[in-house]
Amino acid sequence: MSAPTHQQDLIALLEERGFVHQCTDREGLAAHLAAGPVTAYLGFDATADSLHVGHLQGLMLMRWLQKAGHRPLLLIGGATTRIGDPSFRDSSRPILGEAQIQANIDGIVRVFSRYVALDEGSLVNNAEWLDGVGYLEFLDQVGRHFSINRLLTFDAIRQRLDREHSLSFLEFGYTLLQAYDFVELSRRRGCTLQLGGADQWANIINGVELSRRQGGAQLFGLTMPLLATRDGRKMGKSAQGAVWLNAERLAPFDFWQFWRNCDDRDVARFLALFSELPMDEVRRLGALQGAELNEAKVVLANAATALAHGADAARAAADAARGVFADGARDAGLPLVRISRERLAQGLSLTELLVDNALQASRGAVRRLAAGGGLRLDGMPVADPDAPLTGEVDGRRLSLGKKQHLQLRLDD
């Protein structure tokens, strides 16, 4: 679809697609966006080496802003990761070492850059300014502008205390650090818009207020709704664990299947948020019923996987799904994995079969699965997944871990 422009009401487009939960000044922000390029930031603490589907709404929102000509900033919390955001958590996050934080930053940047074009100035680490600020200086510049009474009214803090869970002074100060980040990005990069999930509302408005109290630029904040699936699961989680956005943690095939298996009631909402289809097409697909709705789920799975892993990976996952699930298997209804005899004669290994069909993310992942005893043929562990297969695999049961079972079928 055509990209929105500065002059169009971008806020209205984002609202129509379901991205907007709260805004500090909707009309002011709409005018600000229409006036010309705006620098907006989205922040992540480096608590893992990837992002998951729960972060995807923010990535897509930033993508829409960039398509409209605005400037994205990715803020990595190299400093705040050492503290941990207490928002709506019952316990402290584990403290990570510097080497792990840097490895996590590298992984997050790789994921982010698939959704948003990053240039040399697009990536910022808050350690750049927080590592150098003194405690007394911070209290003087920032602490004087915050009331403890008001901070205690914010849901993220109040709920933690109401449940009588410990909240360290370190964590209590997190919201001040995030407010300081916003002001520093405004000063250093001309950033005037912060994006975040609904649980970040208090942190965002504290930054807006801090800039005002210090006589700085007018800042804006926009939060997105916290998503849950219709069956009540937190977005980004599946029965098997987190739905990661990098292939090293989750194979593209499994990522594709997450979207293909979504609840019927989520299809239209997810198409609006996680694809770039025009809204007329989103509404048409979302209105389908019965078996036709499954085709809409395939469209969703293809679109989401193409953005996360590339068009080739999306096609491979879709092709694998058609081959695996189109026909019923002859053994207890197991899904099929088809192997051509020609390919078998060329020396096909289980490692190649699983990677080529997007059933595993990499050769290394297959070898690790085999080394742990999780790769089995007819219940027997596969010692060497790199060994060439023979015609004897026809009809045999292939198990990947305890829950995923397939049947191999030779085709002429």
Swiss-Prot record:
The keyword Translocase does not apply. It is found in: Cytoplasm. SUPFAM superfamilies: Alpha-L RNA-binding motif, Nucleotidylyl transferase. It catalyses: tRNA(Tyr) + L-tyrosine + ATP = L-tyrosyl-tRNA(Tyr) + AMP + diphosphate + H(+). Belongs to the class-I aminoacyl-tRNA synthetase family. TyrS type 1 subfamily. Catalyzes the attachment of tyrosine to tRNA(Tyr) in a two-step reaction: tyrosine is first activated by ATP to form Tyr-AMP and then transferred to the acceptor end of tRNA(Tyr). This is Tyrosine--tRNA ligase. It comes from Pseudomonas paraeruginosa (strain DSM 24068 / PA7) (Pseudomonas aeruginosa (strain PA7)).
